[in-house]
Amino acid sequence: MQLRSRQTQMLFVRDRDIEIHYQATGQGTPFLFFSETACPGDIWNHFQVPEFSRDYTVITHDYRGTGKSSRPTAQYSCDDFVDDAAALLDHLNAGPAIAVGHSMGGRVAMLMALKYPAKVKKLIVASVGPGAPSAPPIPFKMCKEMAEWGYEKYVQEHTLEVGWTREYIQQHPDKVEHFLNIRLNNLPRLEDYLRHVVARQACDLSARIREIQHPTLVLVGEHDHGSATGASHRVAAEALAKELPNGKFAVVPNEAHNYFMTNPDEAHRIIRNFLVSSS
């Protein structure tokens, strides 16, 4: 079902204990965005909301534990994130939606397609793999660096390591600083960040990827080789695309992990071409 309101921002009461903050902008088929690990939904406001709200109803939301949403003290799971999003679509009387997820959000979007297939029309999963059964609850590399540097410096250094190529950092220091400030100013509490990491690590879809029948675009940056675990996002994304029955693989040239911010025009062009070709 298509939505008609131009923009709505409010809290949706998921149940007695959970409120999910969301924003719906535009008109048309729902375009549901899932952010990366422990990142609130307003990260999409810079480029993706203005671009896609011209043709769609863009729905962004803050995961539980981030932004203006509730911060329950129990451990989170990707199932929780999916159930929150599915309930939000029900609340808005919207769907099926084009589900878009970046990094951890891509895995959440795939889980939504598996758990609520009728609520998903198409999938766009960016810079992510299916997970692994042997993934530790918190990656050793993260534990070591966070212990040495502290929470905020870890997030800053990790974002610098995976987010941009060295050339981009040298050529655009002002843009890098701007994005880092956005990320650091919206950090959740440490305990909520770690709950997100544990949820991501526990989300192993590797045995179920072939069950996803939706048209799916797997997107990744050409130089997206870093991750919190030390593995390569690009290698994981390429392997994922080969497993999907209706998967299509695309690369954003010359970019690392943060191409939605550094080269949104190319990312949007690839996405729009996919949406047309998979109609």
Task: Identify the function of each model-found stretch.
Residues R16-K68:
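Conserved HGGG/HGGXW glycine-rich cap/lid loop of the alpha/beta-hydrolase fold
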Residues I212, V218-V220:
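Short beta-strand/loop motif that positions the catalytic acidic residue
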Residues V252-P264:
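Catalytic histidine-centered segment of alpha/beta-hydrolase-like enzymes
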Residues S134-P136, Y154-R208:
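Conserved alpha/beta-hydrolase catalytic His-Asp/Glu region
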Residues M110, L114, K121-G150:
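Flexible "cap/lid" loop of the alpha/beta hydrolase fold
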Residues G101, G105, A109:
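Gly/Ala-rich beta-loop-alpha elbow adjacent to hydrolase catalytic centers
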Residues H223-A231:
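Acidic catalytic loop of the alpha/beta-hydrolase fold
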Residues T60-V100:
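Active-site loop/oxyanion-hole signature of alpha/beta-hydrolase fold enzymes
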